[in-house]
Amino acid sequence: MLVVPAIDLFRGKVARMVKGKKENTIFYEKDPAELVKKLIEEGFTLIHVVDLSKAIENSVENFPVLERLSEFAEHIQIGGGIRSFDYAERLRKLGYKRQIVSSKVLEDPSFLKFLKEIDVEPVFSLDTRGGKVAFKGWLAEEEIDPISLLKRLKEYGLEEIVHTEIEKDGTLQEHDFSLTRKIAIEAEVNVFAAGGISSENSLKTAQRVHRETNGLLKGVIVGRAFLEGILTVEVMKRYAR
């Protein structure tokens, strides 16, 4: 099972938004590039980086930070506002091969095929709030059955997703793995669980679900709990494959 540290960027800084709300932003006095470098040195093979400014405001204010982080692009899965062919190509030219996409794929599933054509590994971000699928930086939501949606997207080459429980994101509440487990088994896709991976108990549960799904629960993404030292690097490494 992979344990993936998460770094969100907003206003050029490392940040977390509680439940995805801009007014609930927490900023951290950490240098993004130094943080990524240290994590790689600690042995983490994948880091989850999301540009919240691009996702929510379609702003490229964080692009200079993404350029700095491109030194470590092979270890990063990048997301946030990837809604156009041009922007996806721009990131790919910086070396970002794993790209997290959502809204554009909901509008045009063939975007997945385009990404593969430019040698990108697309990871679909399935964000749910109260059973509804959310998109456009979590500002909009729709009554869509997640399982049916994923089965349809598999026809366009979808293989891997991040499932985020928005109500738990940044709250330090525990992730409910029941829906994540159901998605992995019924849609038969590789899943990273996010939102509420907030304690060692979360990691223990994830490890159990990883076994129950025969590895379809590929890993977990740890944000605020990591940034605030609630889940230490040592503990996360203990559960990482």
Swiss-Prot record:
GO terms for biological process: L-histidine biosynthetic process; L-tryptophan biosynthetic process. Its main location: cytoplasm. It catalyses: 1-(5-phospho-beta-D-ribosyl)-5-[(5-phospho-beta-D-ribosylamino)methylideneamino]imidazole-4-carboxamide = 5-[(5-phospho-1-deoxy-D-ribulos-1-ylimino)methylamino]-1-(5-phospho-beta-D-ribosyl)imidazole-4-carboxamide. CDD domains: HisA (cd04732). Pathway: Amino-acid biosynthesis; L-histidine biosynthesis; L-histidine from 5-phospho-alpha-D-ribose 1-diphosphate: step 4/9. One of its GO terms (cellular component) is cytoplasm. Keywords: Amino-acid biosynthesis, Cytoplasm, Histidine biosynthesis, Isomerase. InterPro entries: Aldolase_TIM (IPR013785), His_biosynth (IPR006062), HisA_bact_arch (IPR006063), Isoase_HisA-like (IPR044524), Isoase_HisA-like_bact (IPR023016), RibuloseP-bd_barrel (IPR011060). Pfam families: His_biosynth. The active site is at D8, D127. GO terms for molecular function: 1-(5-phosphoribosyl)-5-[(5-phosphoribosylamino)methylideneamino]imidazole-4-carboxamide isomerase activity. PANTHER family: 1-(5-PHOSPHORIBOSYL)-5-[(5-PHOSPHORIBOSYLAMINO)METHYLIDENEAMINO] IMIDAZOLE-4-CARBOXAMIDE ISOMERASE. NCBIfam families: 1-(5-phosphoribosyl)-5-[(5-phosphoribosylamino)methylideneamino]imidazole-4-carboxamide isomerase (TIGR00007), PRK14114.1 (NF010712). This is 1-(5-phosphoribosyl)-5-[(5-phosphoribosylamino)methylideneamino] imidazole-4-carboxamide isomerase. It comes from Thermotoga petrophila (strain ATCC BAA-488 / DSM 13995 / JCM 10881 / RKU-1). The lineage of its organism: Bacteria, Thermotogati, Thermotogota, Thermotogae, Thermotogales. The gene is hisA.
